[in-house]
Amino acid sequence: MVRVKRGVTKHRRHKKILELAKGYQLGRSKLYRHANEAVLKALRYQYRDRRARKRDFRRLWIIRINAAARQHGMPYRDFIHGLKQAGVEVDRKMLADLAVHDPSAFGQLVEVARRAL
């Protein structure tokens, strides 16, 4: 059997990890073992937080819609239910945007929801 030398492979692997660890402090950016741990943990956080961001934004949109709907005398749950009854298919992201940037249009949607109930 021919002996396999792993120098180039190891160097490339280490270089890839140390490149990802750029900007970390102390040994976490210079030493392979520490950098590898830090990078793996960072990638786990990144994966988790990509999913959490979706939940956080939905929560924010709901809070904004609720606040705007209550200014028009209607709670969030009745507003959403009324929109569904009226057949209005506007997602929460757009509703929150309307509530912030175009309150008059949002008020018209509240009236549509109120009539549908």
Swiss-Prot record:
The keyword NAD does not apply. GO terms for cellular component: ribonucleoprotein complex; ribosome. One of its GO terms (molecular function) is structural constituent of ribosome. Keywords: Ribonucleoprotein, Ribosomal protein, RNA-binding, rRNA-binding. The keyword Zinc-finger does not apply. CDD domains: Ribosomal_L20. InterPro entries: Ribosomal_bL20, RIBOSOMAL_L20_CS, Ribosomal_protein_bL20_C. One of its GO terms (biological process) is ribosomal large subunit assembly. Belongs to the bacterial ribosomal protein bL20 family. Binds directly to 23S ribosomal RNA and is necessary for the in vitro assembly process of the 50S ribosomal subunit. It is not involved in the protein synthesizing functions of that subunit. PANTHER family: 39S RIBOSOMAL PROTEIN L20. This is Large ribosomal subunit protein bL20. It comes from Thermomicrobium roseum (strain ATCC 27502 / DSM 5159 / P-2).
